Amino acid sequence: MIFLTLEHILTHISFSVVSIVIIIHFLTLLVNEFVGLYDSSEKGMLTTFFCLTGLLITRWIYSGHLPISDLYESLIFLSWIFSIIHMVPYFKKHKNYLSTITAPSTFFTQGFATWGLLTDMHQSKILVPALQSQWLIMHVSMMVSGYAALLCGSLLSAALLVITFRKVIRIVGKNNNLLNDSFPVDEIQYMMEKKSIFKNTFFPSSRNYYRFQLIQQLDHWGFRILSIGFLFLTIGILSGAVWANEAWGSYWNWDPKETWAFITWTIFAIYFHTRTNKNLEGLNSAIVASIGFLIIWICYFGVNLLGIGLHSYGSFTLISN
């Protein structure tokens, strides 16, 4: 009873604090002068991390296993990983470009786990025989950690695309006005002028310097986080294959979860291929990573709606009986 009460308290404290952090982020976006509020938001995320850590430890103690065996527990674990990713640039004294992604991710993930799922799903249950293995911690923790890192990296790539295409639209609009006012509608002149404007835009002039730096940082951090996430995902898939062979006598069974995990791995393998190809890097790799964001959610969450396959123990019902 004490553990359940403590878990309840930690859950509400962590969600309340991260909600305040989100409000602070909105305020700092509107008013840049609130530097003190930004520092408070970082301390708030640190508080959220400790509350989620205490929540996971408490649940581990009274359940007897690492709390990653069902959808509710994995969502809390996912929120915890988001909070860790959030604090890495903070402790390294880098400008935290991740904060606008990791803080809302923590908020929405924990919010859905706490308020979006049925109350019965919050209760800790005895592990089914298939999960009573030493491979549980390795496989599930690596997969969820990989999902968290890949989601953050994908959102950074999506942000890069938004900033870049907004700039392209502005340039093209400027170019069209220039053509209408100064030149006849001639295709050759249009292409020459368009090429010239694009070339000048990517120079870090005084007007575009901040945006240029932001794009470079988004690309840099996105690549680093996606690299870590891809490594975790690979380890998770390999450890899962070994576990499957021990439990079911086959390394791979092509059930929905395994199939979408393979699709996810393939998408991000394509991303890293485009990064090594000078003709495809930049926007092309960012587009691939952005597609990967949707694929991850289908793999992690969407497949659970089916409730079929060897991973059906992680599924849930939408309507309570």
UniProtKB/Swiss-Prot annotation:
It is a multi-pass membrane protein. GO terms for cellular component: chloroplast thylakoid membrane; plasma membrane. Keywords: Chloroplast, Cytochrome c-type biogenesis, Membrane, Plastid, Thylakoid, Transmembrane, Transmembrane helix. The chain crosses the membrane at residues 17-37, 48-68, 71-91, 98-118, 143-163, 225-245, 259-273, 286-306. Pfam families: Cytochrom_C_asm. It is found in: Plastid, Chloroplast thylakoid membrane. InterPro entries: Cyt_c_assembly, Cyt_c_biogenesis_CcsA, Cyt_c_biogenesis_CcsA/CcmC. It comes from the Eukaryota. GO terms for molecular function: heme binding. Its main location: plastid. One of its GO terms (biological process) is cytochrome complex assembly. Belongs to the CcmF/CycK/Ccl1/NrfE/CcsA family. Required during biogenesis of c-type cytochromes (cytochrome c6 and cytochrome f) at the step of heme attachment. May interact with Ccs1. This is Cytochrome c biogenesis protein CcsA. It comes from Populus alba. The gene is ccsA.
